Amino acid sequence: MIETLYNLPFHILVPPNIKVRRFSIPMPSPMAVFSVILFSYFLVTGGIIYDVIVEPPSLGATVDEHGHSRPVAFMPYRVNGQYIMEGLASSFLFTVGGLGFIIMDQTHTPGKTNLNRLLLTAMGFIFILVSFFTTWLFMRMKLPSYLQP
């Protein structure tokens, strides 16, 4: 019964004979997908959502003992607040640390010489250490008594 109702318009109207090409999007390369994911990771860890909602200044300012205004890159004593440049610097360090882990993972691919494995391991380890200690230093700049007994 319902099928006859569906077929009724096609008995009255004749649909045109059109050849429609199938629309296809080429599959992106793995490096393009990785780049998009890494860039979105950079933006999210940099606090782009916070920056859009709160609209903080790019840099802060403080007055020294002589009355001069000095630029400040880190918002002191506030863990849940940031300047735009502070978020971008921290995000860059998180991304460098993540790249260090990815570089260290590349040492396990077959066909690498021992020298290349050693260089990749050293470079990945250096990326991770620089990222960790610089992020730790940034946290000490935000909270001067951070991890102090």
Curated annotation (Swiss-Prot):
- How does the record classify its membrane topology? Multi-pass membrane protein
Name one matching Pfam family: OST3_OST6
Q: Where in the cell is it found?
A: Membrane
| Annotated TM spans | 33-53, 84-104, 118-138
UniProt topological domain (Extracellular) ranges: 54-83, 139-149
Keyword annotations for this protein, in alphabetical order, are:
Membrane, Transmembrane, Transmembrane helix
One GO CC term on file: oligosaccharyltransferase complex
Record flagged with keyword Transmembrane: yes
Main localisation: membrane
One GO-annotated biological process of the protein: protein glycosylation
Q: Which residues lie on this side of the membrane: Cytoplasmic?
A: 1-32, 105-117
Instruction: Say what the protein does.
Output: Subunit of the oligosaccharyl transferase (OST) complex that catalyzes the initial transfer of a defined glycan (Glc(3)Man(9)GlcNAc(2) in eukaryotes) from the lipid carrier dolichol-pyrophosphate to an asparagine residue within an Asn-X-Ser/Thr consensus motif in nascent polypeptide chains, the first step in protein N-glycosylation. N-glycosylation occurs cotranslationally and the complex associates with the Sec61 complex at the channel-forming translocon complex that mediates protein translocation across the endoplasmic reticulum (ER). All subunits are required for a maximal enzyme activity.
What PANTHER family does the entry give?
OLIGOSACCHARYLTRANSFERASE COMPLEX SUBUNIT OSTC (PTHR13160:SF4)
Task: Please describe the quaternary structure of this protein.
Answer: Component of the oligosaccharyltransferase (OST) complex.
Similarity field? Belongs to the OSTC family.
Q: What is this protein called?
A: Putative oligosaccharyltransferase complex subunit CG9662
